[in-house]
Amino acid sequence: MQAAPISELDTDYTPRYVRLARLLRGQIEDGTYTRGSLLPSSNRLAAAHEVSKATALHALEMLVTSGHARHVEAKPHQVIWER
């Protein structure tokens, strides 16, 4: 499933990393990404959503903070949230 760039998702002044984190969190919560699945890399997220790699990394770290994902050094972020 090809997602629209986050710039097309809303027109408010919410930072892009927050919008991307919300999008990913929604996809985790709706079952697009299930417990144990790997999230796209920051490079792939950056390209797909037309943001910088730093923005994508910040969004992924928000998912770690919220308990939706975990990250082990040199490995992709993994979904840990369960419905």
Q: Where do the model's predicted regions map?
A:
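Extreme N-terminal segment that seeds HTH/winged-HTH DNA-binding domains in transcriptional regulators
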Residues: 1-70, 75, 81-83
